[in-house]
Design a protein with these regions (language model features):
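Membrane-helix interface segments
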Residues: 63-72, 100-104, 145, 159-160, ...
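Transmembrane alpha-helices
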Residues: 112-113, 120-124, 131-132, 145-174
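Glycine-rich helix-loop "coupling/hinge" segments at transmembrane-helix boundaries
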Residues: 12-16, 176-203
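Membrane-interfacial helix termini and adjacent extracytoplasmic/periplasmic loops
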Residues: 11, 15, 20, 69, ...
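Single conserved hydrophobic/aromatic residue that forms the stacking wall/gate
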Residues: 223-232
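Short membrane-interfacial helix/loop motifs at transmembrane-helix boundaries
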Residues: 1-30, 182-184
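Transmembrane-helix boundary motif in ABC transporter permease subunits
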Residues: 44-76, 93, 224-225
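A membrane-interface signal for the N-terminal entry of alpha-helical transmembrane segments
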Residues: 35-45, 201-224
């Protein structure tokens, strides 16, 4: 962050002087704005899809026993232990073989597969901590399975759903490897930042962008911690 305020384009000590020109330059970089918008779209879409699928998978695994259950869970959780580069290359090969274009939605697909195991772990814990007698009482009172799930179970696991969404959004926003392999002409923010490092003259601007991201992350974390403290 210190070098983002340095008036020189050379990243070295001693500093030449103080300036905020690098931050002002960010306002006029349309490619940066497009990359940020793309990342927000991908992160929001991926976290929502992963949370929906993860909630359904966690509900099925915690509530029902069926043939192939363990194998299915192991297959879904594979991205947790596989290197991201293997996941990215594998998805790239599959998409090319199917003749599908590489765009933001291919990145959404990759990020959804990457985030989904985390969502399942979070929602599994939420469902396992539920009092099953509440569900049974709802059914005994004449509510349907779907109505019970919507009116009783979902409100109880709401904290888990929000945790899954926030974690998924953060992981997707920060992810580089899968986005690098699956993106087309529309780049995400991490890929855009990586491309700037090839041009030394762009380093101060990159440092300024990094400073803003650190500031936003710190403020968000402090706000969440304060909210948790008030809640408790």
């Amino acid at each position: 962050p210190i070098f983002s305020f340095n008036s020189s384009q050379i990243i070295a000590f001693p500093l030449s002087g103080f300036t905020t020109d690098w931050f002002k330059a960010l306002l006029y970089q349309e490619t940066l704005h497009e990359a940020l918008t793309n990342s927000l779209i991908v992160a929001a879409s991926s976290s929502i899809f992963a949370t929906i699928l993860g909630t359904l998978a966690a509900r099925s695994s915690s509530r029902y026993n069926f043939r192939g259950k363990q194998f299915s869970l192991t297959f879904i959780m594979a991205p947790l232990v596989l290197p991201e580069i293997i996941v990215g290359v594998s998805l790239l090969i599959v998409l090319i073989q199917l003749g599908l274009p590489l765009n933001l939605w291919s990145v959404v697909l990759g990020h959804t597969l990457l985030i989904m195991p985390f969502s399942i772990l979070i929602m599994n814990s939420a469902f396992n901590n539920l009092d099953i007698s509440l569900e049974e009482a709802s059914l005994d009172l004449g509510e349907t399975q779907l109505g019970t799930f919507r009116r009783v179970i979902l409100p109880l696991v709401y904290p888990g759903i929000m945790a899954s969404l926030l974690l998924g959004f953060t992981l997707s926003l920060d992810e580089f490897i899968i986005a690098f392999f699956l993106t087309g002409t529309e780049t995400t923010l991490p890929v855009y930042i990586w491309s700037l490092f090839r041009f030394p003259k762009q380093l101060p601007t990159t440092m300024a962008l990094g400073t803003i991201l650190i500031l936003v992350s710190s403020v968000s974390y402090t706000h969440l911690r304060a909210h948790e403290t008030v809640s408790h």
